[in-house]
Amino acid sequence: MRRKVKNTKRHQWRLTHSARSIKRANIMPSNPRGGRRF
């Protein structure tokens, strides 16, 4: 299950773990779990 998700969301994972992730976490500190996952 994780292999398929990694391959399907491979580009999104990079964007999520990018500088945008820090900005989103700062904007939504109340939802750190959702921001980190999405």
Swiss-Prot record:
Upper classification of the organism: Viruses, Monodnaviria, Sangervirae, Phixviricota, Malgrandaviricetes
GO CC terms: host cell cytoplasm; viral capsid
Assigned keywords, A-Z: Capsid protein, DNA-binding, Host cytoplasm, Virion
Location in or out of the cell: Virion; Host cytoplasm
Record-stated family: Belongs to the microviridae J protein family.
UniProt name for this protein: DNA binding protein ORF8
First-listed, main subcellular location of the protein, grouped into a coarse class: virion
Molecular function GO terms recorded: DNA binding
Function summary: Mediates ssDNA packaging into virion, it locates to the internal surface of the capsid, thereby displacing the internal scaffolding protein during virion formation. Additionally, protein ORF8 plays a role in viral attachment to the host cell.
